Every structure is written in C-alpha cells, then in structure tokens.
A protein has these predicted regions:
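A well-ordered secondary-structure block
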Residues: 62-134
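Short, well-ordered surface patches within globular domains
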Residues: 2-68, 111
Length: 134
C-alpha cells in the first residue's frame, strides 16, 4: 500500500512538472508587442530565464525599496542596453541578443510580483525591475 502511495505521488509530481514545462514553453514562443503590459512582459521575461545558469539573488534596488518599504524583499532586474525606446527594448528581447542580462529569483515562494520599469535615455538602457513581494 505504501509503495502504491509513493508511486502515485511520483506520478503526480511528474505530471505537475510536465504541465509547468508545457506552460513555460508556450509562453516562451510568444513574441512581445507594444500592447503588452509591463506585468505580461515581466512574467514572460521571468519565465524565459527561469532555467538560466547565470542567475543569482539580487537585492531590490534602493529607490524601489524605499518607495515600497520593507515589502520588496528581493527583485530581479532585467536590463536591456542600446535601446532608444520601449519598442527597441521589446525588439531586442525578441531577438534574444547577448546584451540582455538577467538576475532573477524563483517566484514560487512569493504571492505577488510587482513591476517597475526604468528607462535611462542617456545610457540608452531599459530596466525591468520585477519585485517579489512575500
């Protein structure tokens, strides 16, 4: 009976894993457009880089932390360089250029994801800051 329970639990966890991968793959195939909200954009970015090897935990940027208080525990920052506009940033993301750098955390321990975006016209950098709110 115990073995049967273990087998059932393993089947269920495999099914969940397959479902997660299916959803992730579906999202990755979708191109971003200008009509996408920042939330959709950030979710797509997070999903796409979820398996990225060059990831590490990042503190929420100071300005963001101050505006949100202690809620914002951590953040991923997605930075797109050489952008003249949000449209450029989207085009660059869709082309998957090498100058897209992503620092991310897994969102599974968080109930909410807040989004902030910063465009620096001088440095022509566009940052998406994805806040993880516990």
């Amino acid at each position: 009976r115990e073995q049967a329970c273990d087998a059932a639990a393993e089947m269920e966890s495999n099914r969940l894993l397959q479902e997660m991968n299916r959803v992730r793959t579906q999202r990755q195939k979708r191109m971003l457009t200008e009509t996408d909200t920042l939330t959709e954009t950030a979710n797509l970015l997070v999903d796409t880089y979820q398996e990225s090897p060059d990831t590490y935990e990042a503190e929420a940027p100071k300005a963001v932390k101050e505006s949100l208080g202690e809620q914002a525990e951590q953040a991923y920052q997605v930075m797109l360089v050489n952008c003249n506009s949000y449209t450029d940033a989207i085009a660059q993301y869709n082309e998957e250029r090498k100058d897209v750098t992503v620092n991310f955390l897994t969102t599974q321990d968080y109930t909410q994801v807040g989004i902030s975006s910063i465009y620096d016209p001088v440095g022509k950098q566009f940052s998406f800051i994805v806040l993880l709110l516990p």
